Amino acid sequence: MITKAIYPGTFDPITNGHLDLVTRASAMFSHVILAIADSSSKKPMFTLDERVALAKKVTAPLKNVEVLGFSELMAEFAKKHNANILVRGLRSVSDFEYEWQLANMNRHLMPKLESVFLMPSEKWSFISSSLVKEVARHGGDITPFLPKPVTKALLAKLA
């Protein structure tokens, strides 16, 4: 049986924490779509096309992972791609409340859409794209937190 899961997010930029979760999800499901939200309201540093390109580059070794951009409701995107599982990462208890609300809204919009929550590996549990960008803006070392092509792209954006 093919199980298709979606791992949605803004991924601005994709971090080693995101890569850890998508790698683990790819071992659990037949097909994983890394769905990158347009999120223009968040004013991302990278364009949607740039985020998709970076994610494709760093997930290339994961043969069952597909990277797509989207701008519609997640439930609509899931229906369009015949997926009924959402993978979400939970770094802390504070993430849970927001994720719980999203999961319930998505289930309301698409009753067969299940949310699966994964804990990050301990070494990535404190990482977020926003935090990494802030460290980079102040000249801190971001190399431990991002795949090499992403580090290069982020430093180029800030130059």
Curated annotation (Swiss-Prot):
NCBIfam families cross-referenced by the UniProt entry: coaD_prev_kdtB, cyt_tran_rel
Enzyme class: transferase
Subunit record text: Homohexamer.
Gene name, Swiss-Prot/TrEMBL: coaD
Binding site for ATP: T10, F11, H18, G89, L90, R91, E99, W124, S125, F126, I127, S128, S129, S130
Pathway annotation from the record: Cofactor biosynthesis; coenzyme A biosynthesis; CoA from (R)-pantothenate: step 4/5
Function: Reversibly transfers an adenylyl group from ATP to 4'-phosphopantetheine, yielding dephospho-CoA (dPCoA) and pyrophosphate.
Coiled coil stretches, renumbered: none
Record organism: Yersinia pseudotuberculosis serotype O:1b (strain IP 31758)
Record family assignment: Belongs to the bacterial CoaD family.
One Gene Ontology cellular component annotation held by this UniProt entry: cytoplasm
Cofactor: Mg(2+)
Catalytic reaction equation(s): (R)-4'-phosphopantetheine + ATP + H(+) = 3'-dephospho-CoA + diphosphate
Superkingdom field: Bacteria
Gene3D superfamilies: HUPs (3.40.50.620)
Site feature (Transition state stabilizer) residues: H18
Keyword DNA-binding carried by entry: no
GO biological process: coenzyme A biosynthetic process
Record's protein name: Phosphopantetheine adenylyltransferase
Keywords: ATP-binding, Coenzyme A biosynthesis, Cytoplasm, Magnesium, Nucleotide-binding, Nucleotidyltransferase, Transferase
Binding site for substrate: T10, K42, M74, R88
A GO molecular-function descriptor: ATP binding
The EC number(s) this enzyme carries: 2.7.7.3
Location of the protein in the cell: Cytoplasm
